[in-house]
Design a protein with these regions (language model features):
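Sec-dependent N-terminal signal peptides
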Residues: 2-11
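Sequence signature of WD/YWTD-type beta-propeller architectures
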Residues: 13-297
Length: 297
């Protein structure tokens, strides 16, 4: 009996933590960022379970996202903004997260990349074609990958899990990666119009700063402290490459280069929505996707 109890405790400890219940909403920006405060969010995916990690296509017409509705399997879905339809792209025994359109130009024809949790739980960077087929391993020896952001068709910034978590720049062509920072957060983004990537970095003082690294020179520059009370420190860039959005509780704040503080631009609570975590911005700047905590059902 004691052995059975110990086995049960061990198995419980090994079980993965359940994914949070989250929904995705689209917030239209008909009058630029200033119109976000009065905009009405519309549901993109609100099925029971995990709907998260939205990413717009280059033309802004589609939104990739990861979803897990049965508590077991995470796959990639796509929302078509023109038809309002959601289509499942991957159906695999593995888990696919962080779907990201490949930086191929104006269309999504080259497919998308994902962080794939393989059958042995190894997490590496893979790619699929545009219809969610033909999986291909991009970086064989770089692991365990948590999140990623493309700099260009060859170079990719990676959040590598570890003690501490590290920021690495990798080349798909060479298969090699280089550690460029330690102690980073999960929110990685290429800054529009540049070959720089932003990341959240924990200072020795305990403060969290948004910083940028130039992928060519490796120069790192601080930008601003994160929003006070931001639990997950999730952020996104507006298309101008000058303005950052960051979530904090049920609110979204903006910061523009040169500003001394953050400005509130949206409150999900006014629409009876929960706390905001991840944010994605359409390349045209006409819509923002927000991930909110799922209401109790």
């Amino acid at each position: 009996m004691r052995a059975l109890l110990l086995l049960a405790v061990f198995l419980q400890a090994q079980a993965p933590a359940p994914l949070p219940g989250t929904d995705i909403y689209l917030v239209p920006l008909k009058g630029g960022l200033a119109s976000m405060k009065t905009a009405t969010p519309t549901p993109l995916s609100t099925a029971p379970g995990y709907d998260n990690q939205p990413f717009f296509s280059a033309d802004g017409r589609r939104v990739l996202f990861a979803a897990n509705h049965d508590g077991k399997q995470t796959d990639v879905f796509v929302f078509n903004r023109e038809t309002g339809r959601v289509t499942q792209l991957t159906t695999t025994p593995e888990n696919e997260n962080s779907p990201t359109y490949l930086p191929s130009g104006k269309t999504d024809a080259d497919g998308f990349s994902v962080v794939r949790s393989e059958m042995d739980k190894t997490q590496r960077l893979w790619r699929f074609n545009a219809t969610g087929r033909e999986p291909y391993l991009l970086l064989t020896d770089v692991k365990p990958v948590g999140y990623h952001a493309w700099v260009d068709p060859d170079r990719v910034a990676l959040f590598i899990l570890g003690e501490p978590n590290s920021l690495q720049l990798a080349s798909v062509n060479s298969g090699k990666s280089e550690v460029v920072a330690n102690g980073i957060g999960r929110s990685l983004h290429r800054i529009p119009g540049t070959r720089a990537v932003s990341f959240v970095h924990r200072e020795p003082s305990g403060d969290y700063w948004i910083k940028q690294i130039d992928a060519d020179s490796r120069k790192i520059e601080p930008l601003t402290k994160v929003v006070d009370g931001a639990a997950d420190r999730d952020m996104a860039w507006m298309p101008d490459g000058k303005t950052i959005l960051m979530s904090g509780g049920t609110k979204v704040f903006s910061w523009t280069r040169g500003a001394s503080s953050w400005t509130e631009v949206f409150d999900a609570a006014l629409h009876n929505l929960g706390a905001v975590s991840r944010i994605a911005v359409s390349p045209k700047g006409d819509a923002i996707a927000i991930v909110v905590a799922e209401p109790k059902r």
